[in-house]
Amino acid sequence: VLGSPLTCDFACISLSDLLTPWEKIEQRLRGAAAGDFCIVLYNPSSKKRTDHLRRACDILLEIVPPETVCGLVRSIGREGENCTLTTLGELRDTQVDMLTTVFVGNSRTRVMDGRMVTPRGYRGV
């Protein structure tokens, strides 16, 4: 849908603090950012948790540059599927819901032909 945002290693982190304390989520976000992982965020927002994506972006922005390529996909594999490319700096103020999956690129992620691509390291890519 987005292109090839995830290659090699990546982290998948839920932003729901119903079963995981927010402090643990913060620790995971910082670790993934420090390790230069591509990061997938799910459960980014709900009726009660409207600010978790903003808070997660603030944590990532402590380590990751604001121009980092990000992608949003709503309703993956369902009718009405929609994808958007943005940057981490812009993602902070983006409206999302529980049907949205957020992809944060790493230092090698680029937009190529309108797609989010994280190269595996081959020459010329």
Question: PLM features: residue spans?
Answer:
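A contiguous loop/helix-start segment that scaffolds small-molecule binding in enzyme catalytic cores
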Residues: 34-125
